[in-house]
Amino acid sequence: LTRILAIDTSSAWCSVALSIDDERPAFLHQKVSAGASQLLLPWIEQLLNTAKINLSSLDAIAIGVGPGAFTGVRLGLASVQGLAVATKLPVLPVISLDAIAAELIKAPAFLAAAPKRFLVAIDARMNEVYWAHYETTPSGLPVRLGEVALTSPESIVLDDIEFVAGSAINEYGDRLFARSKNVFLKTQLDPEIGVSALGVLACAKLSWCAGLAQDIHQLEPVYVRNKVAFTAEERKQANI
């Protein structure tokens, strides 16, 4: 019996999922304008109450650790730290692009394209993109090839990429495809998919089965970038 609570607040959405054994996960997911802090804990309580279990009876808590919105990533980690310390539960950190990839493989457009390699790219603000390459596997979730990168849209490497997904598509358009030699790539897209607790949960289940749960004191955010915003001088030079 495996019971995992999954949380993600690294984007503009508050997202919580509860998985009990092989049952369909309970899932709450909503776009939030002023951060997820007011929704997160009540939602967790709601899911636990509906399932008639308490927090301490969980096996682990999964959390999206970024990259994404700095304040959202911090909120999620702080909330999980409070919950895990109180209950002595282990945690399962999940990188946001991995969570997107885990859900993407079920999307109709992706299934129709059946790519071997694909790219997940999300808007990182400041004219930059968080991105990573993935490879599909015969069974289970896709495998990330290397670390998550942070570059300008034009610098994204698209060699052998057959499908592109993520918020960077709508934000940067043709700039993303500057280095693509594949004229069909612009038709193999999923611009709407984003990170959610269901994707976090899918990755976390694999981590749990592989024995990769961590002590809460090992939990760290994945920011990729160390800087939150342009300075006034940088904004002036870039005409922002």
Please place each PLM-identified region on the residue numbering.
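N-terminal beta-alpha supersecondary unit
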Residues: 1-65
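Surface "functional belts" at beta-alpha junctions
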Residues: 23, 35, 90-194, 223, ...
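Residues at secondary-structure transition points
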Residues: 31-39, 70, 74, 78, ...
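DPxDG-like acidic metal-binding loop motif
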Residues: 62-96
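Acyltransferase
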Residues: 185-240
